Each structure stands twice: as structure tokens, then as C-alpha cells.
From Swiss-Prot:
Keywords: Cytoplasm, Methyltransferase, rRNA processing, S-adenosyl-L-methionine, Transferase
EC code(s) of this entry: 2.1.1.174
GO CC annotation, single: cytoplasm
Organism from which the protein derives: Streptomyces coelicolor (strain ATCC BAA-471 / A3(2) / M145)
Domain of life: Bacteria
Gene name for this UniProt entry: rlmG
Protein role: Specifically methylates the guanine in position 1835 (m2G1835) of 23S rRNA.
Protein name: Ribosomal RNA large subunit methyltransferase G
Entry keyword annotation includes Lipid biosynthesis: no
GO biological process: rRNA base methylation
GO molecular function, one term: 23S rRNA (guanine(1835)-N(2))-methyltransferase activity
Length: 377
């Protein structure tokens, strides 16, 4: 990537030579160009929120920025890209969305996330650190910035306007208003599940902002909860890509002797899973881990993997994440261990499972979703 401060060699994480998606886009370039052309003072505390693969903080590393991200993969990509660019790792402070934000912010740069709820939570958490002189600039592709996006900046930060579009990217400029009466932060959000989801019917769930379908139970998970495996056969169970943890919590409620691992690459998701598990006062054993899929889980150590794989990476549709999850599951399963997957029928996961495991069984299905089982032989 060419920046006003020189060339940067960037990659997504984990690196895949077959992946043609770049680690930056026109919105990153637009923001960096604006900062240089307008000679925006990058002194004091510079905070970069939602930098997807570390492109912004790598370019701005000489100014010792603070990165705030919800993504473990984005955080690891940032580390790799900083090292590749010869930047001292200590020059960038890496925070997660679960960490306390800085007490004072002099420059706030926001890569607009897909989730409006996550943007709301981030702005509300950072707002007390803003002052009248804080420079606030958001960036995103035109298709990612909506009237609701601008209203959030207006309601939480202050008067807001946008730039002209360049290469289908747009900037957002907000002026902090010290007199603004901001709303209370509604996140995390708690509610009770419907009465038709098996073991978790009527039970509480807790969602932090940014978790998929944060204000309701998504229909794929609802279908999965109705068709989970019978309890008592599995000792080591992994809820892979756990989201708010309802699937693993349902298993643990049915079989308190099972040892559960909840894992997701989202810090918000794992915090939600932990809160959901505690809200249901489960008596079982559970570990909650933010990470890259099943990295760090020993080979042949797991009896059951439960998975509702995502098939979008930001705005791109891709099956790469599901395939990595499936291959990881095969590695960690014991012989005879099972992978249970829910997915949209049109995604054809049964083909991939047969290719990888040599078998795939349809457990349940309707017009939209299927639950599939693959056994490691």
C-alpha cells in the first residue's frame, strides 16, 4: 500500500496465497491521504478504531497510535504487518473492545464497522475522552455509510458532515460538542430466548454489541438448538465460532459433566458467551478463549465440535473461513469424534464435509437450513 509516509507491505491474517483480497481498501487510502493533505496534527493520543488488518496503524506508526479492535485476526495481522514494516512493536498500543479506552483522545479515526451496534458502543465508550479540540474522522466505503451511521456520530459526538466520494469511499467529519447530552450505553443487551428452542427455551442470553443478531436469536442458531446431539456421549466439547454461546450453554445444561470450550475470534462474542453461560448458572466446566479457530487445541483431544460458520468476511462472501473451521475440527477430533454443523442449504457444506471426512449425514433440514454431522474415522 502506498501511503504519504512511504510504502507498506501488508497482508491479511492468517496469510493464504490463494486469498486475493487486500489488507486495505480505498477508504483506508482516502483517510490517510486526507490526514497528510490537510496536515492534521497527529500529536497527543491518536486512537484508531476498527482497523481491519492494521493498514492504518501501520502507516501511522511513527505517531504511536492506539488501536482498538474487536477482531483477534485483525490484531494478529497488525502485529505481522508492523514487524514486516520494520516498526518497533511497542510504538503501537493494541487494545480490544473489552479493554478500558484511553482517558483522553486527541485524534479519533474510525473505520466504520458493519455493525451499527458496535459503532454505537465504541463511540459511547470513547465519548468521555473527547474534548473540544479532538479531531474525529470516520472512513468507509459508500455502501457501508448510511444515514443511520451519520445520525450516530451526530447523536454521540456532535455536528457531523461527510466528504465527497472518492473511489467509492467517503469520509465522515464530526466535531465534538462538550454540551451534548449523550444517551446511556445500552450494551450489553440481555433478553430471554423464545419457547421453541429446546433446552434453552425461555432462558437468558447476553449479547455485547457487534455479535451477530445481537438483539434477537438468529434463525440458523434457532434451528440448530432444536437439533443438538443427545447428551451423555461427549466429554470434551467445543463451541467453535461461539458467538453469544447459546449452543455450548445448551450442551452444558443438558450434560454438566461435559467440558466445554467456547472459542471465537471476536472479543465481544467471547464476552457474550461468558455472560450467557453465567446468566444461566450452569454447573459444568467451561473455558472461554479468543483466538484463531482451534489454534492451540491439541490434536485428537475433542469428542464433539459444534459449528455455525460465518460465510462473510466484512463485505465479501467467502467459504474460506468455514473450510478452515472444518479442517481444524478434523485435526482436534478423536477417532469417532463428531463435527455438527448448521448452515444455509445453498452453501453445500455436505460436499466439503465428504471431501474432508469421507462422510456427511443429514441430521435435520428445512427449506433454508441443514444440520449436518461428520464423523472422524
Amino acid at each position: 500500500m502506498t501511503t504519504p509516509w512511504g510504502e507498506r507491505v501488508l497482508s491479511r491474517f492468517p496469510e493464504d496465497p490463494r486469498d486475493r483480497l487486500r489488507a486495505w481498501d480505498a477508504s483506508d487510502e482516502y483517510l490517510l491521504g486526507h490526514l497528510a493533505e490537510r496536515e492534521v496534527p497527529l500529536s497527543g493520543t491518536v486512537v484508531v478504531v476498527g482497523d481491519r488488518w492494521g493498514a492504518l496503524v501501520t502507516a501511522l506508526a511513527p505517531h504511536r497510535p492506539v488501536q482498538i479492535t474487536d477482531s483477534h485476526l485483525a490484531r494478529e495481522a497488525t502485529r505481522v504487518n508492523l514487524e514486516r514494516s520494520g516498526v518497533e512493536p511497542g510504538s503501537v498500543r493494541l487494545l480490544t473492545t473489552q479493554d478500558p479506552p484511553p482517558d483522553r483522545v486527541d485524534v479519533l479515526l474510525v473505520r466504520v464497522p458493519k455493525s451499527l451496534a458496535l459503532l454505537e458502543d465504541q463511540l459511547l465508550r470513547l465519548a468521555p475522552a473527547l474534548h473540544e479540540g479532538t479531531v474525529v474522522v470516520g472512513t468507509g466505503m459508500v455502501k457501508e455509510i448510511h444515514t443511520s451511521t451519520l445520525r450516530l456520530f451526530e447523536r454521540i459526538v456532535g455536528p457531523t458532515r461527510t466528504s465527497l466520494a472518492v473511489k467509492k469511499a467517503r469520509l465522515i467529519f464530526a466535531e465534538p460538542d462538550p454540551a451534548l447530552k449523550r444517551p446511556a450505553n445500552p450494551w450489553p443487551l440481555g433478553y430471554r430466548l423464545p419457547d421453541d428452542v429446546g433446552r434453552l427455551s425461555g432462558r437468558p442470553v447476553v449479547n455485547h454489541a457487534g455479535v451477530f443478531c445481537a438483539d434477537r436469536l438468529d434463525i440458523g442458531t434457532r434451528f440448530f438448538l432444536r437439533h443438538l446431539p443427545a447428551p451423555g456421549r461427549f466429554r470434551r466439547v467445543v463451541d467453535l465460532g461461539c458467538g453469544n454461546g447459546v449452543v455450548g450453554t445448551a450442551v452444558s445444561l443438558a450434560d454438566p459433566d461435559a467440558e466445554l470450550l467456547f472459542t471465537d475470534e471476536s472479543f465481544q462474542a467471547v464476552a457474550s458467551a461468558r455472560a450467557t453461560y453465567r446468566a444461566n448458572e450452569v454447573a459444568g466446566q467451561a473455558e472461554f478463549r479468543v483466538g484463531d479457530g482451534l489454534a492451540g487445541v491439541p490434536d485428537g483431544s475433542v469428542d464433539l465440535v459444534l459449528n455455525n460458520p460465518p460465510f462473510h468476511s466484512h463485505q465479501a462472501t467467502t467459504g474460506a473461513t468455514a473450510w478452515r473451521m472444518f479442517t481444524g475440527a478434523r485435526r482436534v477430533l478423536r477417532p469417532g469424534g463428531e463435527l455438527w454443523v448448521v448452515g444455509n442449504r445453498h452453501l453445500g457444506y455436505h460436499v466439503r464435509l465428504r471431501r474432508l471426512f469421507g462422510n456427511s449425514e443429514l441430521v435435520a433440514g428445512d427449506r433454508k437450513f441443514v444440520v449436518l454431522k461428520a464423523v472422524k474415522e
